[in-house]
């Protein structure tokens, strides 16, 4: 669940058109001496550390403007440009929309993806989630859609299974409880309203643990407004995958300690159904591990949900 095998078949620095690389160097004020493609993630766009001739490092993301993921990249750079300086995220230095390519240059953040099975690293992640809730409430981007508007049509996997023939390989517990899962899933939006700017895609490979112990949150491509507890609950299956008592964690964390357990179960149910449905779709050709990740997430979340609900 920690994203170590999540790498897509990324575009490389030398695959960018000469004119795009030249413009990046011009705007950066130095030549690129070396480029290192960064691991992790499911997007096939360029994501690389650039070592500049003047000794500075920057981080570049880029994608063809006609690519199916270009809108996601545009959302990310527009969001990054509007995040407050107090948010634990790399600063966007500049962006380019030039000769058919969308480019974003960020501050380079040294570090590694946090390992959720290491108590100190998990503690840093949990502290950062508390910081996000405090810093991003109310949302500094009030014009964003709500989580119900963005995700309501997507988080209906159990309903679709119930209305059609469920997949033959669906586990016995989910098959027996399919109607109840669809009913619980349908209630998650009742609890999710709020005015916090949410990331909605927190995973270890979307975070970096810096040498000073602070966490930088990356890849703001799916922002929306909703309840402050959503991001922690969305990350919690990745924590549960390490055998950690995630129910106890949610009961004691400041962001979730006062939240109705029914609300948590409803959102977990919706996540499990989403992953169960998406994992059975054909794999994107340049992100072959995505469906495997979703299948693992579905199993972990469904198992945890079964223990919570005691059905």
Where on the chain are the PLM-derived regions?
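A cross-family kinase active-site recognition segment
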Residues: 2, 112-175, 193-195, 224-225
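Active-site acidic catalytic loop and adjacent metal/ATP-binding pocket
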Residues: 39-52, 59-60, 183-230
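Juxta-kinase regulatory segment immediately upstream of eukaryotic protein kinase catalytic domains
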Residues: 1-35
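Hydrophobic/aromatic-rich alpha-helical bundle segments in the mid-to-C-terminal region
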Residues: 143-144, 282-295
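A conserved alpha-helical element in kinase catalytic cores
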Residues: 57-99, 115-131
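Active-site activation/catalytic loop segments of kinase-like enzymes and analogous catalytic loops
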Residues: 229-258, 268-286
């Amino acid at each position: 669940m920690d994203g170590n095998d999540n790498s897509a078949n990324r575009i490389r620095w030398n695959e960018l058109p000469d004119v795009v690389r030249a413009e990046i160097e011009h705007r950066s004020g130095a030549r690129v001496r070396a480029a290192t493609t960064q691991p992790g993630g499911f997007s096939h766009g360029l994501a690389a550390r650039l070592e500049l001739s003047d000794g500075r490092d920057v981080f570049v993301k880029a994608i063809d403007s006609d690519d199916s993921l270009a809108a996601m990249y545009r959302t990310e750079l527009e969001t990054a440009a509007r995040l407050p300086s107090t948010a634990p995220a790399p600063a966007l230095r500049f962006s380019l929309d030039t000769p058919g390519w969308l480019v974003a240059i960020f501050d380079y953040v040294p570090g590694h993806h946090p390992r959720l099975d290491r108590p100190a690293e998990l503690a840093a992640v949990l502290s950062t989630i508390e910081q996000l809730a405090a810093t991003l409430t109310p949302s500094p981007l009030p014009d964003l859609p709500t989580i119900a508007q963005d995700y309501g049509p997507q988080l209906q996997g159990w309903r679709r299974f119930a209305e059609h023939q469920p997949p033959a390989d669906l586990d016995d517990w989910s098959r027996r409880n399919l109607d109840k899962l669809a009913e619980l899933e349908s209630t998650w939006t009742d609890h999710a309203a709020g005015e916090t700017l949410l990331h909605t895609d927190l995973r270890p490979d979307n975070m970096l643990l810096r040498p000073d112990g602070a966490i930088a949150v990356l890849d703001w491509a799916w922002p929306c407004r909703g309840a402050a507890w959503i991001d922690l609950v969305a990350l919690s299956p990745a924590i549960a995958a390490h055998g950690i008592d995630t129910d106890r964690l949610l009961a004691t964390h400041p962001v979730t300690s006062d939240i109705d357990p029914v609300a948590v179960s409803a959102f977990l149910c919706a996540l499990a159904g989403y992953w169960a449905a998406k994992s059975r779709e054909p794999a994107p050709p340049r992100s072959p591990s995505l469906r495997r990740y979703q299948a693992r997430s579905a199993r972990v979340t469904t198992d945890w949900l079964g223990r919570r609900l005691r059905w």
